[in-house]
Amino acid sequence: MSDHPTAYLVLASQRSGSTLLVESLRATGVAGEPQEFFQYLPNTSMSPQPREWFADVEDQSILRLLDPLIEGKPDLAPATIWRDYIQTVGRTPNGVWGGKLMWNQTPLLVQRAKDLPDRSGSGLLSAIRDVVGSDPVLIHIHRPDVVSQAVSFWRAVQTRVWRGRPDPVRDARAEYHAGAIAHVITMLRAQEEGWRAWFTEENVEPIDVDYPYLWRNLTEVVGTVLEALGQDPRLAPKPVLERQADQRSDEWVERYRRDAQRDGLPL
């Protein structure tokens, strides 16, 4: 029996480059079927809708750009069924499991894990262990340029496309809004601070990768994760996703930096 871990969990915030990593790991065929399993809200069974990211915002110039809320249906599945589904769907035939967790999803994970039998503890680390079924390799992906990350988020939340290219017509309707981007920057910074505080509190030492390094060295990073799982690092593929940012995103980033300097917005 291998002494290597048989699971990994990518820890991140939205638009940090985590999809680039997990899709490359998925492409190996031996590194699980990683999904963002913990994004679904129990009251709707859906991932957060655009307006839910701006729940405390009253500025109508922001809200008018976001799709209205859909009611959804509550997720009534027992905790054990929920756990078993996650373990089954995230695993490749060789037994390796993969997943992705954002900091804003950690309360949901901890809350749902409370109802599992034979808990190993009550905190986040125990919740991860008890839901995944073992102690996974933890990989922390972060993006030092939070302005670019926030612009990417703001554009995606308007188009509802989180990977690949959006519909050109819908993308053309997306609008720059400094206040919305500022809101997202504050949210993303809080998520990253949450991860780093938790690492310190729990003495967790993940594989730590920033987005610029990941983008330039994707095959190497995938190989590192494969090696940690006891898999052949030579299976790491060439990049399978293209960069979503384009000239328009770059223009929004530069425009926001100017607005932030002038108006005292977060950077």
Curated annotation (Swiss-Prot):
Keywords linked to the UniProt accession: Carbohydrate metabolism, Transferase
Top EC class of this enzyme: transferase
EC number: 2.8.2.37
InterPro entries: P-loop_NTPase, Stf0, Sulfotransferase_Stf0_dom
Binding site for alpha,alpha-trehalose: Q14, E33, P34, Q35, E36, F37, F38, Q39, P48, W53
Residues annotated as catalytic: E36
Pfam family, one: Sulphotransf
Pathway: Glycolipid metabolism
GO molecular function: transferase activity
Record field: catalytic activity: alpha,alpha-trehalose + 3'-phosphoadenylyl sulfate = 2-O-sulfo-alpha,alpha-trehalose + adenosine 3',5'-bisphosphate + H(+)
Observed phenotype of the null mutant: Loss of trehalose-2-sulfate (T2S) formation.
Effect on the protein of changing E36A: 100-fold decrease in reaction rate and 3-fold increase in trehalose affinity
Superkingdom: Bacteria
Note: The reaction catalyzed by Stf0 follows a rapid equilibrium random sequential Bi-Bi mechanism with formation of a ternary complex intermediate.
Matches recorded under NCBIfam families: TrhSuTaseStf0
Protein function: Catalyzes the sulfuryl group transfer from 3'-phosphoadenosine-5'-phosphosulfate (PAPS) to trehalose, leading to trehalose-2-sulfate (T2S). The sulfation of trehalose is the first step in the biosynthesis of sulfolipid-1 (SL-1), a major cell wall glycolipid in pathogenic mycobacteria. Cannot use free glucose and unnatural stereoisomers of trehalose (alpha,beta (neo-trehalose) and beta,beta (iso-trehalose)) as substrates.
Protein family according to the UniProt entry: Belongs to the Stf0 sulfotransferase family.
Quaternary assembly: Homodimer.
Identification of the protein by name: Trehalose 2-sulfotransferase
Record organism: Mycolicibacterium smegmatis (strain ATCC 700084 / mc(2)155) (Mycobacterium smegmatis)
